[in-house]
C-alpha cells in the first residue's frame, strides 16, 4: 500500500494489471471499475500490463514488447479526462490485433488518434457487432496461449451481453474492456457462429404458432431467397404437365437420372418437401431443415429459378444504330421525294410525272397494306417472333399466318379489280371521258393526286403571258392577263397544305422510329412503305401548292419544311419507345395509320382518276399494287434468313 501511495494515482491500468496478473475470478470487476471511474494506476502495474500484452501476441519480426513502454501508455491521456478509459481499452485492443502496426503508430505519435478512430468505427448498434467480430478475428490470429481448463471460448454475443449487464449496452468502451479481461485470463475466442445459429435464425423468420415451418412459410422464405417456382394448389396439381416451362420432380429412385438434368429445374416449396418425404401437415422441423437446406443452396447456386437473361435479338440494333439507320432512312425518303419534285418543274415531263405518280399510288397502297397486315400485325400480336429459341419457333404459327393474311389482301385486290373493270368496261358520262378527276370538295391528298397531266405544270409568270394555271377551274378570272388579288381561302391554302403535310410526316416519322426500335428488318419494311406513299404524297402536295399559285421556289421551300417534321417524329419515337410493350402499342398505331392512308386516301385517288389512256393507267396501278405486296410478302417470309 505504501508503494501505491508513493506513485502517481492512475485509475484503470493498475486494476487492469492486477486483473491480468492475479487472474481474478470475476472478469466483470474491471468493467465495473471502468464504468465507475474508480481505481489507481502506477508504473509497476503498467509494467505488468506491458508484459502480459507482450506475452499474448506474436510478432514475426521479433519481440513485440520492445516498442511499447510505460510512457507510451501514460501518453494516451490523464485518467480524469473524459473517454480516457475507453481510449486505453481501444489502444490495447489495437496492439493485440496488430502489434507491428501499433508499434509504427507509437513511433509516429498517432496511437491515441488510432484508438479514437477505432471507437468511432464501433459506435452504434449496427456497427459494433460486425466490427467486434472482425477485431476478434485479428486478435485471434495474433495471440498465443491456450485457454484455461474447462473454460469455454468467448464469442462477440457474450462480450456484448456482459457489457450490457454492466449497464453500458452498445458502448464500445465497456465492450473492449470486457475483451481485455478475457485476454488477460487467457480465454480463447470463437469468432464465427455455431451451426445451430443458422437454424435458429431461419426459424425466427416464421411467425406461426407452431415450432415448425409450414408450407406457406417455406414458400415465402424461398421467395425471399429468390428460389422456387410457383406452388400449385391441390386442385390444379394434376394439370402440372400442361404448364409451360414447368417441370415436376421425379422420385429420387428414378432410374438413369442424371444430375445434369436437374441443374435447370426450378422447384417449388411443395416440390422440395416431396423430395425429402416431408409431410405438408407436419411442416419442416429443425431437424428436417438441415436436410432440405442443400436443396435451397442448389437452387440458388444453379440459378434455376432466376429470371432467364433476355438475350439480345439477333436483329436488334444498338441505340446509336437506331438513330443512324432511322435518320438515313428518313433522309433518303425526303431526298427521293424532293428529287421527284423536279419532274413537276419540267413542262416536258408533265405526262411522265403523271404516270410516275399513278404508279407510286399503286405501290403505296400495296406497301402500306402489305406492311400493316403481313409484317406489323403478326409482330404486334406476337405471332411472328425473331431470335427466339427453337422450341418457341416450333410452337409459332410460321408461314401459315402470313398466307392467311395474303388471302385477306387478295380479297381486297379482287374487289379493286371488280370496281376498276366495271369502271373501264361500262359506259361513262361524256364529262368523265375528258380526262378530268371526279368531283370533290375541299383540299385533300386525293385531290392533289388526281390532277391531270395538263395540270402538273407550274403557272406562267405574268411576263410570260397568260396561260391556264392550276386554279383555272375554280377561278376563271385568273385567265385574264391582268393579275388579280387572290381570295383569302386561296392565300391560306398553301399553309393549310403545309400544316397537314407536316403532321402527316410527323406520324410517318413516329412509325419509322418505332419500327427501327424493334429491329432493322421491321425498320426496312416500314421505311419502304413510307417511301412508297410519301413520294406520291409529296408530288401531289407540291402540285397543289403550284395549283394555289405559288412560285416553284417557295413551294419547294414549304415542301421541305413539312418534310423536316418526319425527323422530329423519328427522334421522339426512338427516345420514348424503349420497352417491348410500348413498342407493340406504337406499332399498332402505325398499323391504323397505314391502313387509313392506304384505304381512305390512296385507294380512292386510284379509283377516281381519269386519263385518256385508261388501260395504261390500269396496268400501272396493278404493277404498283402487286409489286408492293410482293416485296412485303418476300420480306415477311424470308426476313429471318437475311443478315445485316
Swiss-Prot record:
Membrane-topology descriptor: Multi-pass membrane protein
Stretches assigned to the Cytoplasmic side: 345-355, 426-495, 551-555, 605-614
Cysteines paired by S-S bonds: 59-64, 67-103, 153-188, 266-305
Residues with site note (Essential role in Zn(2+) sensing): 508
Residue interval(s) of motif Essential for SLC39A4 endocytosis: 449-451
Keywords: Cell membrane, Disulfide bond, Endosome, Ion transport, Membrane, Metal-binding, Signal, Transmembrane, Transmembrane helix, Transport, Ubl conjugation, Zinc, Zinc transport
Keyword Amino-acid biosynthesis: no
Basic and acidic residues bias: start-end ranges: 233-244, 456-467
Pfam family, one: EF-hand_Zip
Extracellular-side positions: 28-323, 377-404, 516-523, 577-583, 636-644
Domain of life: Eukaryota
Signal peptide boundaries: 1-27
GO molecular function: identical protein binding; metal ion binding; monoatomic cation:bicarbonate symporter activity; zinc ion sensor activity; zinc ion transmembrane transporter activity
A GO CC annotation given for this chain: apical plasma membrane
Binding site for Zn(2+) 2: 505, 508, 534
Region (Disordered): 231-259, 456-484
Residues noted as binding Zn(2+) 1 in the record, renumbered to the chain: 504, 508, 533, 537
Entry comment on modification after translation: The extracellular N-terminal ectodomain is cleaved when cells are Zn(2+) deficient, N-terminally cleaved SLC39A4 is internalized at a faster rate. Under excess Zn(2+) conditions, SLC39A4 on the cell surface is rapidly endocytosed, ubiquitinated and degraded.
Domain notes: The two metal binding sites M1 and M2 that are halfway through the membrane form a binuclear metal center. M1 is essential to Zn(2+) transport, while the other, M2 appears to have an auxiliary role presumably by acting as an additional transport site that can modulate the properties of the primary transport site. The binuclear metal center plays a key role in Zn(2+) sensing.
Subunit note: Homodimer.
Similarity comment: Belongs to the ZIP transporter (TC 2.A.5) family.
Task of the protein: Selective transporter that mediates the uptake of Zn(2+). Plays an essential role for dietary zinc uptake from small intestine. The Zn(2+) uniporter activity is regulated by zinc availability. Also exhibits polyspecific binding and transport of Cu(2+), Cd(2+) and possibly Ni(2+) but at higher concentrations.
Identification of the protein by name: Zinc transporter ZIP4
Lineage: Eukaryota, Metazoa, Chordata, Craniata, Vertebrata
Amino acid at each position: 500500500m505504501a508503494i501505491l501511495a508513493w506513485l502517481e494515482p492512475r485509475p484503470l491500468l493498475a486494476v487492469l494489471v492486477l486483473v491480468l496478473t492475479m487472474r481474478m475470478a470475476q472478469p466483470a470487476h474491471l468493467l465495473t471499475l471502468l464504468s465507475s471511474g474508480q481505481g489507481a494506476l502506477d508504473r509497476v502495474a503498467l509494467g505488468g500490463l506491458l508484459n502480459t500484452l507482450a506475452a499474448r501476441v506474436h510478432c514475426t519480426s521479433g519481440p513485440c514488447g520492445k516498442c511499447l513502454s510505460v510512457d507510451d501508455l501514460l501518453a494516451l491521456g490523464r485518467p480524469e479526462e473524459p473517454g480516457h478509459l475507453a481510449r486505453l481499452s481501444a489502444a490495447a485492443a489495437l496492439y493485440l490485433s496488430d502489434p507491428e502496426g501499433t508499434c509504427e503508430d507509437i513511433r509516429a505519435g498517432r496511437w491515441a488518434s488510432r484508438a479514437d478512430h477505432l471507437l468511432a468505427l464501433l459506435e452504434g448498434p449496427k456497427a459494433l457487432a460486425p466490427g467486434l467480430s472482425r477485431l476478434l478475428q485479428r486478435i485471434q490470429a495474433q495471440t498465443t496461449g491456450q485457454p484455461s481448463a474447462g473454460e469455454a471460448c468467448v464469442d462477440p454475443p457474450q462480450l456484448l451481453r456482459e457489457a450490457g449487464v454492466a449497464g453500458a449496452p452498445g458502448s464500445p468502451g465497456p465492450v473492449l474492456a470486457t475483451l481485455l479481461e478475457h485476454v488477460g485470463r487467457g480465454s480463447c475466442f470463437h469468432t464465427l457462429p455455431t451451426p445451430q445459429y443458422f437454424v435458429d435464425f431461419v426459424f425466427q423468420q416464421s411467425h406461426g404458432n407452431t415450432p415448425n415451418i409450414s408450407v406457406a412459410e417455406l414458400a415465402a422464405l424461398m421467395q425471399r431467397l429468390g428460389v422456387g417456382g410457383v406452388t400449385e394448389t391441390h386442385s390444379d396439381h394434376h394439370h402440372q404437365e400442361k404448364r409451360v416451362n414447368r417441370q415436376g420432380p421425379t422420385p429420387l429412385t428414378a432410374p438413369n437420372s442424371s444430375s445434369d438434368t436437374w441443374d435447370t429445374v426450378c422447384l417449388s416449396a411443395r416440390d422440395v418437401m416431396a423430395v425429402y418425404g416431408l409431410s405438408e401437415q407436419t411442416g419442416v422441423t429443425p431437424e428436417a431443415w438441415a436436410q432440405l437446406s442443400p436443396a435451397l443452396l442448389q437452387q440458388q447456386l444453379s440459378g434455376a429459378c432466376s429470371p432467364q437473361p433476355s438475350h439480345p435479338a439477333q436483329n436488334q440494333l444498338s441505340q446509336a444504330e437506331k438513330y443512324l439507320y432511322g435518320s438515313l432512312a428518313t433522309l433518303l425518303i425526303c431526298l427521293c421525294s424532293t428529287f421527284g419534285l423536279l419532274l413537276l418543274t419540267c413542262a416536258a415531263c408533265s405526262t411522265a410525272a403523271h404516270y410516275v405518280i399513278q404508279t407510286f399510288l399503286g405501290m403505296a397502297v400495296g406497301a402500306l397494306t402489305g406492311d400493316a397486315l403481313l409484317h406489323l400485325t403478326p409482330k404486334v400480336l406476337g405471332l411472328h417472333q425473331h431470335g427466339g429459341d427453337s422450341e418457341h419457333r416450333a410452337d409459332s404459327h410460321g408461314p401459315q399466318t402470313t398466307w392467311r393474311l395474303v388471302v385477306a389482301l387478295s380479297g381486297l385486290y379482287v374487289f379493286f379489280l371488280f370496281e376498276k373493270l366495271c369502271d373501264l368496261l361500262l359506259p361513262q358520262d361524256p364529262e368523265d371521258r375528258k380526262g378530268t378527276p371526279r368531283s370533290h370538295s375541299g383540299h385533300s391528298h386525293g385531290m392533289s393526286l388526281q390532277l391531270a397531266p395538263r395540270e402538273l405544270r407550274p403557272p406562267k409568270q405574268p411576263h410570260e403571258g397568260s396561260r391556264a394555271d392550276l386554279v383555272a377551274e375554280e377561278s376563271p378570272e385568273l385567265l385574264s392577263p391582268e393579275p388579280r388579288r387572290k381570295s383569302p381561302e386561296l392565300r391560306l391554302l398553301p399553309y393549310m397544305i403545309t400544316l397537314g403535310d407536316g403532321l402527316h410526316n410527323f406520324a410517318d416519322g413516329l412509325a419509322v422510329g418505332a419500327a427501327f426500335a424493334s429491329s432493322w428488318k421491321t425498320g426496312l419494311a416500314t421505311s419502304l412503305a413510307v417511301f412508297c406513299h410519301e413520294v406520291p404524297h409529296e408530288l401531289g402536295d407540291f402540285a397543289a401548292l403550284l395549283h394555289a399559285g405559288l412560285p416553284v421556289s417557295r413551294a419547294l421551300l414549304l415542301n421541305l419544311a413539312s418534310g423536316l417534321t418526319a425527323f422530329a417524329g423519328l427522334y421522339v419515337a426512338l427516345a420514348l419507345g424503349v420497352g417491348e410493350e410500348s413498342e407493340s402499342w406504337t406499332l399498332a398505331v402505325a398499323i391504323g395509320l397505314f391502313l387509313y392512308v392506304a384505304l381512305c386516301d390512296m385507294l380512292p385517288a386510284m379509283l377516281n382518276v381519269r386519263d385518256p389512256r385508261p388501260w395504261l393507267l390500269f396496268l400501272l396501278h396493278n404493277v404498283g399494287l402487286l409489286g408492293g405486296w410482293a416485296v412485303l410478302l418476300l420480306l415477311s417470309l424470308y426476313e429471318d434468313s437475311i443478315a445485316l
